[in-house]
């Protein structure tokens, strides 16, 4: 078998959180392409993962935790934003030199820098061209070997798991924000923004991905804001069904936020920071709103609350935008190019 027609991944897909969710959707694209998919978990509890039954039913081969003995020369091994993968590279490269690292962040891991200097990563993959150029510039200073490749791909997003809500008949105006539990995912003025935007109905918000770290940063949410630690307390589907808008000021610069696709597929209009991957994902004024200041967040949230017809039009446009950016055909074509390049890497 051509080694590029099968792929090994270090890690396990998930239903919540950036890298795990990203991996899940890409596995679906690879299977649709006829790629043979193998998972080498990095956690011994992988059999308890929610997606374990689905992976087996789809024909994905799941090996033992860190079971590198299954690798043959020429097998590509990918990892999505995994520090554990970087730490294992010396051992992995005793079996295959086709090591591929996908950094989901806008910054570099220190271990990633070291691995680049040592020539342990054969290919770097990115979802965002701007991030690729920035990272490549920094990494090339550490190792100018032209055989090390830097590519972008078009990530697949599976919209079937999210229901599009064209109309929400409730007595309140639903809003919220969603992320993993990380204080940096919250802007310090989050509560100020939620308090001061106005709506013709009572506001009700959900903060999904909230714990003591967020509270230490932004303060205790108002009584009309429900908080949930993760999807086990409040699922993504429940969240988007609730939210007319996703009002999400953060202190981070996002790379290619999966929650953007989820919101667009669900009919929740995005009101987000005017930086990072949001600038490529959101068509300002047509599919969502890009904000430079807390006043922008307050204004656009109020506008969406008082103009339901405009909000509905933007939600429909955003749904089409999600298909344009993350559709299966475009993603498959992109991944074909990536696998063709992987097949050219030294074995």
Regions found by a protein language model. Name each.
Residues 107-148:
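A short, active-site helix/loop in glycosyltransferases that binds the activated sugar's phosphate group
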Residues 269-272:
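Short hydrophobic beta-strand element within catalytic cores of glycosyltransferases
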Residues 237, 260-265, 279-280, 286:
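Short alpha-helical segment that forms part of, or immediately flanks, the ligand-binding pocket
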Residues 133, 156-234:
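Conserved catalytic-core segment of nucleotide-activated headgroup transferases in glycan assembly
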Residues 18, 295, 306-346:
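A charged, aromatic-enriched C-terminal amphipathic alpha-helix characteristic of glycosyltransferases
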Residues 244, 267:
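A short alpha->beta transition loop at the rim of the catalytic pocket in nucleotide-sugar-dependent
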Residues 11-24, 183-185:
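A short, glycine/small-residue-rich beta-strand->loop->alpha-helix junction that serves as a flexible
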Residues 284-295, 303-308:
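Conserved acidic donor-binding segment of nucleotide-sugar-dependent glycosyltransferases
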């Amino acid at each position: 078998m051509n080694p590029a027609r099968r792929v090994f991944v270090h890690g396990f897909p998930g239903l919540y959180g950036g890298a795990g969710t990203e991996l899940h959707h890409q596995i679906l694209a690879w299977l649709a392409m006829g790629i043979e998919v193998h998972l080498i978990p990095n956690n011994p509890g992988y059999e308890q993962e929610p997606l374990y039954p689905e992976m087996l039913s789809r024909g994905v081969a799941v090996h033992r935790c860190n079971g590198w003995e299954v690798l043959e020369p020429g097998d590509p091994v990918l990892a999505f934003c995994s520090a554990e993968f970087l730490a294992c590279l010396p051992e992995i490269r005793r079996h295959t030199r086709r090591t591929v690292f996908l950094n989901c962040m806008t910054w570099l891991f220190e271990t990633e820098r070291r691995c680049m200097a040592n020539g342990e990563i054969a290919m770097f993959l990115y979802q965002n061209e701007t991030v690729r150029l920035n990272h490549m510039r920094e990494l090339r200073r550490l190792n100018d070997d032209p055989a090390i490749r830097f590519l972008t791909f078009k990530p697949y997003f599976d919209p079937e798991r999210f229901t599009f809500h064209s109309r929400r008949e409730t007595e309140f105006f639903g809003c919220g924000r969603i992320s993993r539990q990380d204080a940096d995912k919250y802007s310090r003025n989050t509560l100020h923004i939620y308090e001061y935007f106005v709506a013709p109905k009572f506001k009700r918000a959900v903060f999904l991905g909230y714990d003591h770290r967020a509270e230490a940063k932004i303060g205790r949410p108002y009584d009309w804001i429900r908080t949930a630690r993760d999807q086990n307390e409040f699922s993504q589907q429940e969240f988007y069904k609730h939210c007319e808008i996703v009002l999400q000021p953060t202190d981070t610069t996002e790379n290619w936020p999966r929650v953007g696709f989820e919101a667009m597929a669900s009919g929740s209009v995005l009101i987000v920071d005017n930086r990072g991957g949001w600038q490529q994902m959101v068509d300002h004024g047509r599919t969502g709103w890009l904000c430079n200041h807390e006043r922008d967040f307050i204004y656009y949230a109020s506008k969406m609350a008082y103009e339901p017809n405009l909000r509905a039009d933007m939600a429909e446009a955003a749904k089409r935008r999600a298909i344009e950016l993350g559709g299966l055909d475009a993603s498959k074509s992109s991944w074909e190019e990536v696998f063709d390049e992987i097949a050219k890497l030294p074995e």
